[in-house]
Amino acid sequence: MWYCYILRNKLPQFKNNTYNGSTNNPMRRLRQHNEEIKGGARATHGKGGAWEICTMLSGFPNHINALSCEWRMKCPSGKPGKREGKYQGVRGRVSSLNGILPLERWTGKCIVDNMDFNLKLHILSDVVQYLDLTCVPEHITIEIVDVIDSSCVELDKEMYSFEE
């Protein structure tokens, strides 16, 4: 299973810093972003290791669809380049989902329509206010949680080492 996620930094000096990505192992990837293990993104490096997942969309049928969703989260307008100011920060990143989630396809590279599979959106209780729940299509289940951790993740435990 593949996941798309939005991270936020919990440190006051980096409170407006966000990052989004895709992975097949969110907890390992979070540890990388927090510099506990090798492999985090350049954008999250040197920011105090205080990243947390504030939204996580799961259920992608393949890596292509997950990467297409990741790109659309980075470019909510559908055009490459710098994100508009209204899509920056935690509020902007989460509110951009209002326009992204209802799309039939994230990009032209998607090989199936989004309505053809079920997705689940885990979202933190303190950011759900930025999501217009009326925009969320029926094939996406919403779970409002206080923390997004390993209990929100479904992994093939034989394929991945699963450490917290």
Model-derived regions, located:
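GIY-YIG nuclease catalytic motif and its immediate N-terminal context
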Residues: M1-C69, L97-E164
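Short arginine-rich
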Residues: N34, G39-H45, W71-R91
